[in-house]
A protein has these predicted regions:
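Active-site gating loops and adjacent loop-to-helix segments of metal-dependent hydrolytic enzymes
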Residues: 78-110, 147-169, 262-281
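Acidic/glycine-enriched edge-of-secondary-structure segments
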Residues: 13, 17, 165-169, 186-195
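A metal-dependent hydrolase metal-coordination microenvironment
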Residues: 8-140, 214, 219-257, 264-265
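Hydrophobic, aromatic-enriched interface-forming segments
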Residues: 123-176
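N-terminal amphipathic alpha-helix/helix-capping segment at the start of soluble metabolic enzymes
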Residues: 1-11, 185
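Catalytic beta/alpha-barrel core
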Residues: 46-49, 170-177, 195-200, 220-225
Length: 281
């Protein structure tokens, strides 16, 4: 892998939603980026949950393939009793104060892990949050908790963990202490461009206008598994509220190879323009 070079975007395909093993993904950050490059993606963003990026932004070369990486994150925020996710992108280096904000969010996740162990009476069966998480360098998610519950034989099936102890209705998980509007405001104040990750259509119709008024700039409409009609409807919601569109695989690596889906540059021009990056001829 060659070291990062300057950003320059012309044409190609985008994957703006990816995860590594620094949050709930399976693979190392460099492997994720290399996999995207091998698939012909030309602009990618590792968006680990509530963490600063592991790789610098810029242009990378893997063999004969080149790819541009954006410094980014996926930030969780509470709204109307729900957990929503905000994709936060930077055109250059993520500011240090925002990196520290994200490390604080990762430390909250570590505290939530230990609080869950205590609330569920599982302190003898589940390990404490690792030092890396307590230091804000690893984001512990419900995926990690579900795996720990399976390994400890507290549950016998993956879905049982999410339907039972990890269901927010169980009251065993600490509620988020950051609201979605606060997540938007913090990202914008740091100079980021932000997009609402994987919104449900009804939620987008109900709340996109409200969030746009708070500073939201984009809506994730392109992702594997959604049909053309839903994608078009999300596009209409975005157009109504003057939001650009983003897209990505949300690939974690656990189900095998990265999906062949990628977001075409012709749909991502408004996003790239919002970042202030040159697109060339």
């Amino acid at each position: 892998m060659s070291p990062p070079g300057p950003l320059s975007i012309r044409r190609g395909r985008l994957d703006l939603h990816l995860h590594s093993n620094r949050s709930d993904g399976r693979h190392e950050p460099r492997f994720v980026l290399q996999t995207c490059a091998a698939a012909g993606v030309t602009l990618a963003a590792l968006t680990d949950h509530d963490l600063p990026p592991a790789l610098d932004g810029g242009a990378y070369t893997f063999g004969e393939r080149s790819i541009i990486h954006l410094e980014a994150a996926e930030v969780s925020g509470a709204w109307a009793g729900r957990e929503l996710h905000l994709l936060v992108y930077f055109p250059s280096k993520m500011p240090e104060d925002y990196r520290e904000l994200l490390r604080g969010r990762a430390r909250f996740r570590a505290r939530r892990w230990d609080a869950f162990r205590a609330a569920a009476g599982l302190e003898a069966r589940l390990p404490p949050a690792p030092e890396e998480a307590l230091a804000g360098r690893l984001a512990l998610t419900r995926h990690h908790l579900a795996r720990a519950l399976l390994d400890a034989e507290v549950v016998s099936r993956w879905q049982e963990a999410f339907d039972g102890p990890l269901n927010p209705a169980s009251g065993l998980l600490l509620p988020l202490d950051l609201s979605f509007p606060e997540a938007i405001a913090g990202a914008r104040a740091a100079g980021a461009v932000c997009s609402w990750a994987h919104p449900e259509l009804d939620d987008a119709r109900a709340w996109a206008g409200t969030f746009a008024g708070m500073g939201l700039q984009g809506l994730e409409s392109g992702r594997p598994g959604i049909g053309r009609l839903m994608r078009e409807e999300l596009g209409r919601v975005a157009h109504k509220h003057r939001l650009f569109l983003t897209g990505g695989t949300d690939w974690h690596g656990w189900s095998g190879e990265r999906p062949s889906f990628s977001f075409p540059m012709r749909e991502g021009h408004a996003f790239v323009s919002a970042l202030g990056l040159p697109t060339g001829p």
